[in-house]
Structures are given as structure tokens and as C-alpha cells.
From Swiss-Prot:
Competitively inhibited by pyrrolidine dione antibiotic moiramide B (CPD1). It holds the Pfam family Zn_ribbon_ACC. NCBIfam families: accD. This is Acetyl-coenzyme A carboxylase carboxyl transferase subunit beta. Changing residue 49 to A: Vmax decreases 8-fold. InterPro entries: AcCoA_carboxyl_beta, Acetyl_CoA_COase_Trfase_b_su, ClpP/crotonase-like_dom_sf, COA_CT_N, Znf-ACC. Pathway: Lipid metabolism; malonyl-CoA biosynthesis; malonyl-CoA from acetyl-CoA: step 1/1. Disulfide bonds: none annotated. It is found in: Cytoplasm.
Length: 304
């Protein structure tokens, strides 16, 4: 027996360890491989390059509001395919697919609760639901959020992440721009603060309506914010756009937004601002949250 055969006879094969899917993920910016649980504890912010990844609507609201205080609003509202719209796929099929993928009925989630003990109403977009596009249900839920803020005499916060108006609802989608803007006028008349938080991306009809109507417009770092996208603009003007065009840092230099706030600092910053605007005691800084625990969304059958 040769020495190679002797070595081979002493080698015991081992089974390949099976790693469940979703345990690891990769940063979209720097390519760093990240432990999923650690990334969630860091509010979907890359610990290496500080890239702010997209966050689900429910995770965002649960990371903002005080635990045990959240009450969802407008969950009974569901989208309808009244136009029987069809492009490469039926609209009702797109809705069913998005509902199955995200567990949400539509692209906006609204909740009321407390922020450091202060009553607030908060709304957040679910970008994974048809690109966070604004349809009639998104508009109706936003108006519901405004009405609740007026009823409770409290501030409203909205986290935008949208590609714009939903083309499958045509004019009914476009009219939400006026509808939501008119609702916010009531907040202004009452003297109640509305803070708009612009996340990546905030585009189209959403950026052209309530997303830019905040008493304070705050953006996350490097968020893409605008009406038409950079590629569309370049093709139209036939010129190369400057580096960082339509990003948060570019917009704050031009005076289009008020401030840029990192996601881990957002909760305390919003509470501090609202306390001043509402003439309330400043919040006491607390230790960083250990993570976000989100209750499962109840099973739902998409409408045929």
C-alpha cells in the first residue's frame, strides 16, 4: 500500500453542514457579507460602510414607536381593480403577488402610538409592494392618518419610500396627490406638526405631493429623492448629471431638504424635534434598542 493510499484510508468523510436560507446577506453598497440578525439589530444599516438598506414598513414603525403602544389604522382598506387594468399582467394578479410576497394589503402602513410617551400618528411605505406606488388605498390610508392626528391633536410622521403614482390605477392614482395635500392643509390650520422622512427612494407623484410638504423634511443618508429618475433626465437633456445628483447630500446643499439623519439616531431626533414643536419636555435619551420584534401579519386571502 502506497503512502497516499494509507493517508486516504484514514480520512473520514464528513457531511456538509446545512445553513438555513436568510441567515446571511450582502451589503448592496460595499459587498460585505453580514449576519442577518446583526443587521436587523442595527436597523438595516451596514456596520461597515453605513449604507442604509431598505426597511419594511412594519419594522420601521416598530423601531420608532414605544413598544406596546401601537394600534394599526386603515387595515380594512383594500385595493380594487375597478379599471380591469392589464399591461403585461393583470393588475389583480400583480396585487395578489405583492400581497403574498409582503404580507401587506397595500403599500402604506399607518399606526398610532407613542414616541417617548408622546402621542403620535406614523405612516410608512412598504417599497416591496409594487415599488411603494401610490394608489387609492395609499391615499385613503394617508388621509386616515391625518384625520387621526387631528382627532388626537398630535403630530404626524410619514416615512416615504416610493416610485410614485401607480399607473395601474390611472387618474385615481394621480388624484391622491391633491387629496393628500388637501388633507395636510387641515394639519397646518390646526397648527399640528407634520414631519416627512424621505428614504431611498422617494420619487414621482409621492415626492411631488405630501412627501415634500412637511413642516420639516428629513432625509436618510444617500437617499434618492426627486420626480423623474437620473437616467430619464440624462436622456432628456442629453447631458451628464453631476455626481450625487438627487441624493440627500446634494439636495441639502441646494436647500431642498432641512436635514439628514442617520437611521439609528432618527427616533431620538424626531422625539426631540416634536417635543419642542409641541412645547413638551425633552425626551430622555435611552440605550439603543436591542432589535425589532414584529408580530406576524395575520393570514389574508387576496381578493380575486
Amino acid at each position: 500500500m502506497s503512502w497516499i493510499e494509507r493517508i486516504k484510508s484514514n480520512i473520514t468523510p464528513t457531511r456538509k453542514a446545512s445553513i438555513p436560507e436568510g441567515v446571511w446577506t450582502k451589503c448592496d453598497s460595499c459587498g460585505q457579507v453580514l449576519y442577518r440578525a446583526e443587521l436587523e439589530r442595527n436597523l438595516e444599516v451596514c456596520p461597515k460602510c453605513d449604507h442604509h438598506m431598505r426597511m419594511t414598513a412594519r419594522n420601521r414603525l416598530h423601531s420608532l414607536l414605544d413598544e406596546g403602544s401601537l394600534v394599526e389604522l386603515g387595515s380594512e382598506l383594500e385595493p380594487k381593480d375597478v379599471l380591469k387594468f392589464r399591461d403585461s399582467k393583470k393588475y389583480k394578479d400583480r396585487l395578489a403577488s405583492a400581497q403574498k410576497e409582503t404580507g401587506e394589503k397595500d403599500a402604506l402602513v399607518v399606526m398610532k402610538g407613542t414616541l417617548y410617551g408622546m402621542p403620535v400618528v406614523a405612516a410608512a411605505f412598504e417599497f416591496a409592494f409594487m415599488g411603494g406606488s401610490m394608489g387609492s388605498v395609499v391615499g385613503a390610508r394617508f388621509v386616515r392618518a391625518v384625520e387621526q392626528a387631528l382627532e388626537d391633536n398630535c403630530p404626524l410622521i410619514c416615512f416615504s419610500a416610493s416610485g410614485g403614482a401607480r399607473m395601474q390605477e390611472a387618474l385615481m392614482s394621480l388624484m391622491q396627490m391633491a387629496k393628500t395635500s388637501a388633507a395636510l392643509a387641515k394639519m397646518q390650520e390646526r397648527g399640528l406638526p407634520y414631519i416627512s422622512v424621505l428614504t431611498d427612494p422617494t420619487m414621482g407623484g409621492v415626492s411631488a405631493s405630501f412627501a415634500m410638504l412637511g413642516d420639516l423634511n428629513i432625509a436618510e443618508p444617500k437617499a434618492l429623492i426627486g420626480f423623474a429618475g437620473p437616467r430619464v433626465i440624462e436622456q432628456t437633456v442629453r447631458e451628464k448629471l453631476p455626481p450625487g445628483f438627487q441624493r440627500s447630500e446634494f439636495l441639502i446643499e441646494k436647500g431642498a431638504i432641512d436635514m439628514i439623519v442617520r437611521r439609528p439616531e432618527m427616533r431620538l431626533k424626531l422625539a426631540s424635534i416634536l417635543a419642542k414643536l409641541m412645547n413638551l419636555p425633552a425626551p430622555n435619551p435611552e440605550a439603543p434598542r436591542e432589535g425589532v420584534v414584529v408580530p406576524p401579519v395575520p393570514d389574508q386571502e387576496p381578493e380575486a
